Amino acid sequence: MKASQFFVSTLKEAPADAEVVSHKLMTRAGLIKKLGAGIYNYMPMGLRVIRKVEAIVREEMNRAGAVEVTMPVVQPAEYWQETGRFDKMGPELLRIRDRHGRDFVVQPTSEEVVTDIARQELRSYKQLPKNLYQIQTKFRDERRPRFGLMRGREFIMKDAYSFDRDQAAAKASYQVMAQAYRRIFDRFGLTYRAVAADSGAIGGDLSEEFQVIAATGEDAIVYCPQSDYAANMEKAEALPPQGPRPAASQALARTATPGKSTCADVAQLLGVPLQATVKSLVLATDETNESGEIVRSQVWLLLLRGDHDMNEIKVGKVPGLDAGFRFATVGEIEDHFGCRPGYLGPLNLRQPVRLVVDREVAVMADWICGANEVDFHMTGVNWGRDLPEPDVVADLRNVVAGDPSPDGKGTLAIERGIEVGHVFYLGTKYSRAMNATFLGEDGKPAFFEMGCYGIGITRLPAAAIEQNHDERGIIWPDAIAPFTVVVCPIGMDRSDEVRAAAEKLHADLLTAGVDVILDDRGERPGAMFADWELIGVPHRVVLSDRGLKEGQVEYQHRRDAAATKVASADIFAFIKDRIKV
């Protein structure tokens, strides 16, 4: 490929709405062009990256025994109505109606359609296992699309779905796919972690996220440097504190804290560690009638240490809160506590509440909490003396760095990541909802055991950039770079020797199967180098009249600070030896 034939379009400045590095660089490098909110044209340079990502994913899916299929982007609503997702999913599910008044959805995923394929085509256990995958456009009507391809509305995703005869076989299929994902991300040349994830309402422990490590990542990844333990923040368990609760050493006291409504402010005022304070979080659950009207509400009080944050996923596993909860209204709080938020606590309640205590708080002594009175807190609070021993103690918090690892092999550390893949054991959730069965070996119908497996095809290049960039631009891994090598001849329009040498190297690399581009645009060296550094091509060869007369060319990897002089006769072998695909 020659640059004069290709579409090379770079910008000196990023658009004003570009917030993260990947969005800025993908736009400046001419990889994407915004068409609307969360909707982008994949320009030729960007499409080359996407196609390389797709090729690796497709190779490994096929190697793992999955079979490619393509399902419609626009799907009849009746399939989604069978599972209830047509009504349950929020406005992120784009619903449309055709000229005949029939309802459709623009697919965000394809569980319903693939389950329909299975129930029509897979009739016997003899046809199992099967794994169908597609690489297809998806759409989610995000309320606030942002970060370019990281959180767009239209995107490309690889989604695979496995069908098995029983749970054991389904779990085996899950492991096959999890290993395929590891091969995929290894081939991409990215630093990543496979982390245990919460399985949601389905339960079980078969759910893993694949996170590309990046300081700008939205997700917190918890891991143990001393072992293989890794989980996302939702999943990571905060172990119960070891050892007995300390004995009470302070008297209970009502203490003035004028204008201090946060744990941090109270701790500073009283000259105590933040860890001596307890925060009160007030939730509510609702009981509804057949019409969906609320007939009864229950108020809950959660107690967490002042320096800890609530983990909503863990809270949602507490019996009584597992059917759904919300934060209590100000009116509900005032009715039960007689006080506005900021000074709440478990003492001196107006109406009873259901109390849930975090493991850490359950072993605290002489702690501080709100007095249910504006500008006052209670100090020297102790279990068994000032309050009954807590009935419900649970892990309610996010772990923090330095907590003991759940596997008992060290302490936890936390880093940031970007989720680019997820493998998930589904069980019979969709097959039961759609009555998708096959005849088992005993001649009786049985529901398919399913798994689903996703990779964000267009999200992955953005994640790669967040991990691999510098002040000059993108630094692509060889495997997914738009071009692996760029040949940059200086004065090609003025020197027959430079032109001939550049075209020969270009031709030789093409013949050897190397993805190379020859920059024949006639740009000044500085502008030419700046373009390819911004675009992020990993390997650059510079040919000049002076260098060729000395029998040398210059090679520079995108990560190198300076170029290396290489004998002209050796450059082909030199480059081939350094390409890592």
Swiss-Prot record:
Keyword Cell division in record: no
PROSITE patterns the UniProt entry points to: AA_TRNA_LIGASE_II (PS50862)
Location (main, coarse): cytoplasm
Alphabetical keyword list: Aminoacyl-tRNA synthetase, ATP-binding, Cytoplasm, Ligase, Nucleotide-binding, Protein biosynthesis
Record-level Gene Ontology MF annotations: aminoacyl-tRNA deacylase activity; ATP binding; proline-tRNA ligase activity
Intrachain disulfide bonds: none
Family: Belongs to the class-II aminoacyl-tRNA synthetase family. ProS type 1 subfamily.
Complex formation: Homodimer.
Protein name per the record: Proline--tRNA ligase
Organism: Paracidovorax citrulli (strain AAC00-1) (Acidovorax citrulli)
